[in-house]
Amino acid sequence: MYGIEYTTILTFLISLIFINYIFKTITSTMDFIIYRFLFVMVVLPPFVKTQNYGVNLPITGSMDTPYINSTVSESFLTSTLCIYYPNDVTNQITDNKWKDTLSQLFLTKGWSTGSVYFKEYADLASFSVNPRLYCDYNIVLMKYDGNSQLDMSELADLILNEWLCNPMDVKLYYYQQTDEANKWISMGDSCTIKVCPLNSQTLGIGCSTTDPTTFEEVASIEKLVITDVVDGINHKLDVTTATCTIRNCKKLGPRENVAIIQVGGSNILDITADPTTAPQTERMMRINWKKWWQVFYTIVDYVNQIVQVMSKRSRSLNSAAFYYRV
């Protein structure tokens, strides 16, 4: 009887010692693995240059907020630059290889061959309808025209700023603008905009809501129109919807990866709608040369300074995106 009890106790003690040994072995092994992993994590980062990519936002999200995607200072060798120019350039420059020449000159400023793109547009009106800004950095050249100052100003306001836009059904609803950042942006082949302000009884002020001919015309046969009316008052609108799309837009802030260079003119265009504020000239520059070769030489010389006042972004912009988030 006593022998059986001693044997049971001895077996229990041996099992306890064995289990304790197993636990110590497992603990030592885990310590080794954890310490080795931590050692590797501490030692390797200084020797590895990684890039942290952000979340791929849906189309309804912000398309133009600059996202810093790199853990190190970014080199121009990894960026793309688009230069948009009017067709007047090709009418003046007869050299068929002028783009290759400029690419070689940009190479001397740190921009690799193939990272600089030259894109031609016919006129400001057509460019405003479909502003394809695909590069990391976008520079738009606008030749000054005294007869097109307002068109240039509206286009500059459109592409230099980020807008959040929603559809408008002008046949069914009244609309009002809440503040200075709230505008109605119309784009199309031919936009004619008429407005009728309403009082608190929804009766027209100086116009009849049932007769569009009594509405006040604020734009006529335009491709791009930014409409500003009195804030806080409902308006009935009449729009040529067959050839024009109008959106209720809110200016969210600057689009930092776009700059405009005005070619010619005595002063830089003022794109600020508020008459009480100083003109907005950020990322709006002027080159006063008569020849396009001289213009491009100046851009090559100052390209890195121009880019320094801009911010690289991670998404492109085209006209389809405009109708959701510009």
UniProtKB/Swiss-Prot annotation:
Sequence positions that bind Ca(2+) 2: 177, 228-229, 231, 301
Positions glycosylated per UniProt: 69
InterPro entries xrefs: VP7 (IPR001963), VP7_1 (IPR042207), VP7_2 (IPR042210)
Region (GPR motif): 253-255
Region of interest (LVD motif), residue spans: 237-239
Function: Calcium-binding protein that interacts with rotavirus cell receptors once the initial attachment by VP4 has been achieved. Rotavirus attachment and entry into the host cell probably involves multiple sequential contacts between the outer capsid proteins VP4 and VP7, and the cell receptors. Following entry into the host cell, low intracellular or intravesicular Ca(2+) concentration probably causes the calcium-stabilized VP7 trimers to dissociate from the virion. This step is probably necessary for the membrane-disrupting entry step and the release of VP4, which is locked onto the virion by VP7.
Name of this protein: Outer capsid glycoprotein VP7
Region annotation CNP motif: where it falls in the sequence: 165-167
Protein family per UniProt: Belongs to the rotavirus VP7 family.
A single GO cellular-component term on record: T=13 icosahedral viral capsid
Keywords, sorted A to Z: Calcium, Capsid protein, Disulfide bond, Glycoprotein, Host endoplasmic reticulum, Host-virus interaction, Metal-binding, Outer capsid protein, Signal, T=13 icosahedral capsid protein, Virion
Localization terms from the record: Virion; Host endoplasmic reticulum lumen
Signal peptide span: 1-50
Miscellaneous comment text of the record: Some rotavirus strains are neuraminidase-sensitive and require sialic acid to attach to the cell surface. Some rotavirus strains are integrin-dependent. Some rotavirus strains depend on ganglioside for their entry into the host cell. Hsp70 also seems to be involved in the entry of some strains. In group A rotaviruses, VP7 defines the G serotype.
Disulfide bridges in this chain: 82-135, 165-249, 191-244, 196-207
PTM section of the record: N-glycosylated.
Pfam assignment, any one: VP7
GO MF, one example: metal ion binding
Primary location class: virion
HAMAP family hit by this protein: Rota_VP7, Rota_VP7_A
Residues reported to bind Ca(2+) 1: 95, 206, 214, 216
Assembly and oligomerization: Homotrimer; disulfide-linked. 2 Ca(2+) ions bound at each subunit interface in the trimer hold the trimer together. Interacts with the intermediate capsid protein VP6. Interacts with the outer capsid protein VP5*.
